[in-house]
């Protein structure tokens, strides 16, 4: 397959599936199996940087607000209004989520060789069930004021989301709603907690960059990143709209359809 077409497909899939609750890693694995498309480390780094840039742009005002609150807190110039307290709690929550996500992610990485094609299909079904439960009123526990417990649960879930076929956004939003957070807040927590995880992952992969085979030139790599960025902007807006309108079950239907189709083809 022509490299230009490969990078366009990879950029499209990464941009769409990173934010929609359908598992980007699961879909990239499907591409690898059926279209013989692999994802070199250097290209993986560019694609993830492009998608995290989408989150930063989409939540730029919120991120700036949190950064300013944190700086004022460090400089002891914070007036500690109710809003300031809420923002500090969110920062603390994201830090706790990041810590436990890293722990679970490191543990799961050790068993990467066990990520079989059948496991991906099974995880697609698990994700579809979680999305279905979000829309059909799961039992909600009021633990959102317990920052540590909330961070622990969401962090563990986000770590599990590293498994191909499990949607990171889907499972973290499920956990947040289960804890009593609103849909809007759950979405914010899910996307903001993605930023430190992606940057941490890119930092760890940086050394591998020089050990990998470069099969794409710089133009092709940038082209893939641009496609990931453009379709990422589209998919994050679509996901926000569908979550607010209680239509995540569409993604459940999609995932079950994918599993059925793949099972039929294989």
From Swiss-Prot:
The chain crosses the membrane at residues 4-24, 39-59, 88-108, 114-134, 147-167, 186-206, 214-234, 246-266. GO terms for molecular function: undecaprenyl-diphosphatase activity. It is found in: Cell inner membrane. It is a multi-pass membrane protein. It catalyses: di-trans,octa-cis-undecaprenyl diphosphate + H2O = di-trans,octa-cis-undecaprenyl phosphate + phosphate + H(+). Its EC number is 3.6.1.27. One of its GO terms (cellular component) is plasma membrane. Its main location: membrane. GO terms for biological process: cell wall organization; peptidoglycan biosynthetic process; regulation of cell shape; response to antibiotic. Pfam families: BacA. Belongs to the UppP family. NCBIfam families: PRK00281.3-3. Bacitracin is thought to be involved in the inhibition of peptidoglycan synthesis by sequestering undecaprenyl diphosphate, thereby reducing the pool of lipid carrier available. This is Undecaprenyl-diphosphatase. It comes from Borrelia duttonii (strain Ly).
